[in-house]
């Protein structure tokens, strides 16, 4: 297994797919990186040379990935909550943020239904 950006990427997979194991790198961005470095998309990670791996590592450091990206996202959410905008309030209450209805199907965000004592149909 090759280690890139602090993540062990699987050696038996194609490079394009293996790079998507890094948080913040999707298929499109991994294709773009491989095109810039002139590395074939079909080559397996175990067949990469050490020079190709080092160039991949240096290219990926240019992007915000893994811990830095996760920290950036959480700080953005905290900032929204601090300034008191609508999106921040929805985050604080644990409700859908992007305008979805909550009467029926917001169970993923809201969590398990809470039973109300004394309420029967």
Curated annotation (Swiss-Prot):
Q: Where are the residues of the annotated region Disordered? A: 98-121
Q: By what name is this protein known?
A: Small ribosomal subunit protein uS13
Output the Gene Ontology terms for molecular function: rRNA binding; structural constituent of ribosome; tRNA binding
Please name the source species.
Phytoplasma australiense
Q: Which family does it belong to?
A: Belongs to the universal ribosomal protein uS13 family.
Q: Name one GO cellular component term.
A: small ribosomal subunit
**Function (record text):** Located at the top of the head of the 30S subunit, it contacts several helices of the 16S rRNA. In the 70S ribosome it contacts the 23S rRNA (bridge B1a) and protein L5 of the 50S subunit (bridge B1b), connecting the 2 subunits; these bridges are implicated in subunit movement. Contacts the tRNAs in the A and P-sites.
The alphabetical list of record keywords is:
Ribonucleoprotein, Ribosomal protein, RNA-binding, rRNA-binding, tRNA-binding
Biological process GO annotation list?
translation
Compositionally skewed regions (Basic residues) per UniProt: 109-121
Gene3D superfamilies per UniProt: 1.10.8.50, 30s ribosomal protein s13, domain 2
Highest taxon of source: Bacteria
Provide an example Pfam family for this protein.
Ribosomal_S13
Assembly and interactions?
Part of the 30S ribosomal subunit. Forms a loose heterodimer with protein S19. Forms two bridges to the 50S subunit in the 70S ribosome.
Q: State the encoding gene.
A: rpsM
What PANTHER family does its record include? 30S RIBOSOMAL PROTEIN S13/40S RIBOSOMAL PROTEIN S18 (PTHR10871), SMALL RIBOSOMAL SUBUNIT PROTEIN US13M (PTHR10871:SF1)
Q: Which residues form the signal peptide?
A: none
